[in-house]
Amino acid sequence: MKVEWLTEARAEYRQFLQYYKTEVGLPYAKKFADTILGSINQLAEFPEMGAVKYDTLMGKHDFRALFIENYVCVYRIESDTVYVYHL
């Protein structure tokens, strides 16, 4: 399965990364990037590892939530692709 980031999700990731570079330094920004990308890349192999709450509006539309430390990756599986909507 492949993982594709929607434009908004990629922009959110870049904003977080820039914030960490500016506010806490490059080493923490690299750790943040490794953690986020490592977790999201696992979705290619384990696409159903995120939680679905079918009693919510997002769950009714098959959106999943992958919790990564203090962040939530919102994604949806469509045929052979995982689409990352928000971070």
Language model: regions and residue ranges:
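Basic, Lys/Arg-enriched alpha-helical interface segments
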Residues: 2-3, 7-57
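Enriched for short, Lys/Arg-rich terminal
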Residues: 61, 68-72, 76-87
